[in-house]
Structures are given as C-alpha cells and as structure tokens.
Amino acid sequence: NKQFKIQINASTIDEAYLKELIEKGADLENMEVGHNYYPRKDTGISYTLLKERNSIFEKYGFSIMAFVSSLNERRGPIYEGLPTLESTREIRPLLSAQYLLNAGVDIVIIGDAFASDKEINDMTTIKKDIWTIPLKAENITKEEMDVLSGVHTNRMDPGEFTIRSQEARLKKTSTIKKRNTGERLKYFLTIDNEGYLRYERELQIVMKNLPSDDRINIIGDLSESSLLINQIKPGDKFEFLID
C-alpha cells in the first residue's frame, strides 16, 4: 500500500537483517526508520550504539527518527520520560535534540505529549551546523552581552583546556571592567577583562578546572550543556541562547 509506509525499528535492526529484508523484496521507498523510546529509567540506548545503527541506515538513504524527553509533564504510569538515549533522559529538549542531530538523526520527536511552550520554542532556535548553548543572564553587563552576541567559531587551534572564540576579541565594545573573578571550573564561560590588555574580550569555554585570574571574568556555568560542549570541534560554530 503506497499510502502508508512501514517503519522499522532502528534500535534493534542490524545491517544483516536489513539486507535480508531487501533480498526478500522489501521496497525501501515504502519504508521509514525510527528509533525506539524507553519509558523505564536506565534502559535507553547509548550514543555509541545510536551512531552505529545510524551509519547503517544512512548508507541506504533513510531519514532517521528518534525521541527526546520533556521535562515538563511526563507520560504515565512510569513518569520517567520517553527518550531514545539514556544520557538525555533528564536533559532539556533543546540540548538532547542537538545531540541526536549530531549523531545522524534527521527527525526529532518529543516523546512526552505535554512539552511546555518554552521547550517547543527553544527547539525552534536550533540551526544547522551551529551549536545553540543556553546561558542564564545573571548580572551580565551590557559590554559582556555585546561580546556574547552573534555566532562564534571555535578556533582551528583552540587551547588544550579551552574552547576559544575567534570572533570575540574583534568586537567593538566598551571596556570590559573587572568583575566576578574566581576559580574557573570546567564548563565555565569566561571573558577576559581590560586587565588582560590585547586579550580583552577573549571568550572561552573552560574544559578543565583552572585557577583564579583577576584578568578573567566568569560569565556563567554551562555545565547543563556538557553533552554538547564535549562535541565542539575546531572550526565548529556556536551561539548562546539567553534564558
């Protein structure tokens, strides 16, 4: 029946089984591929398995679907979310959707029926080839906000312990005054203040605990987005969604 497509479970089928279906006359044009969702905690599949399965179906030209959880109102009777990946069960859809897309998923569905308006609106900000990282706007100065704005590119030669914006220091802003300095923990976002002279406006995401430096302002904690930040490679683009 060409009006309805058959969907096969991407989480449980390997290439040998897919080849068997093809040998028996399966019409790939009439098939779709979707990963399972897992209501019980600790049963979602791994990122490694997801990418492994996706690489199979990509070879055959399939679009791939997978699920993320809502943190708003979860489906009963278990109420533990409906994700494909276990690692995204307790993560907001904005982040888990990008994690899936980076692994080769084409279509992301919120498994729980009652996602909040904010969760849905946040997902509409996702852009192809740009990581969207949420940031709580707590006591950020106008000058710092000017540095944060727009799209940033991780330098092709980032530091061993930092993600570095190649655009930030070129921004035309007023002086960045010293404030909120202290120990720089992993996943902290920082901007260099006027004390760092020509490095003023340098924007970094810290990838290892580093000591306090009075020349470096701490802007916020991005640890909520650690799954995404760990995927940022040299040359990757990213921007901040101010919560």
Located regions from the model:
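Catalytic alpha/beta core domains of metabolic enzymes, predominantly
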Residues: 11-147
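Hydrophobic beta-strand scaffold residues
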Residues: 4-6, 64
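N-terminal active-site wall of soluble small-molecule enzyme domains
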Residues: 1
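C-terminal functional modules
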Residues: 138-243
